[in-house]
């Protein structure tokens, strides 16, 4: 599979996973860039983190009602199309340093959501930093470098 085809496949899987979550929970929204910046400002985090989360779970009726950190939770989504018999065991994903920083630093205000979109193991789980770290089997650091 070529790189472009692989990237397209990953984006399609992510879209399926996001749609699955949005259908299951009416409190979830896909925030705009401006909304992401507004939420990060409330959390006193810089805008470099705008690409570190995919969804927001509102604890209020609408985005316009968000006034403080208790009004929302940031969510980073990781999707697999692999059949996982004992979900989430066997789930493999990448996590950026920024995503890990938010997960660790915003305990309770940032969650990682793992989703299997395989028809025979269609499930999701939300994890905070502690719940993730106790499940990690292997972890390695990888640098991505552009020249």
Where are these regions (language model features)?
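Conserved catalytic cores of phosphodiester-cleaving nucleases, focusing on short active-site segments
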Residues: 55-57, 71-83
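Mg2+/Mn2+-dependent nuclease catalytic core
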Residues: 81-105
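Active-site metal-binding core of divalent-cation-utilizing nuclease and nuclease-like domains
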Residues: 35-69
């Amino acid at each position: 599979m070529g790189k472009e085809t692989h990237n397209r496949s990953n984006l399609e899987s992510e879209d399926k996973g996001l749609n699955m979550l949005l259908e299951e929970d009416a409190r979830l929204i896909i925030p705009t860039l401006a909304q992401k910046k507004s939420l990060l400002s409330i959390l006193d985090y810089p805008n470099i983190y705008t690409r570190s989360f995919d969804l927001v779970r509102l604890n209020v009726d609408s985005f316009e009602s968000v006034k403080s950190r208790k009004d929302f939770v940031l969510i980073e989504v990781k999707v697999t199309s692999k059949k996982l018999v004992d979900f989430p065991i066997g789930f493999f994903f990448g996590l950026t340093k920024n995503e890990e920083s938010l997960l660790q630093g915003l305990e309770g205000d940032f969650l990682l959501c793992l989703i299997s979109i395989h028809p025979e193991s269609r499930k999701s789980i939300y994890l905070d930093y502690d719940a993730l770290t106790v499940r990690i089997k292997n972890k390695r650091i990888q640098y991505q470098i552009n020249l």
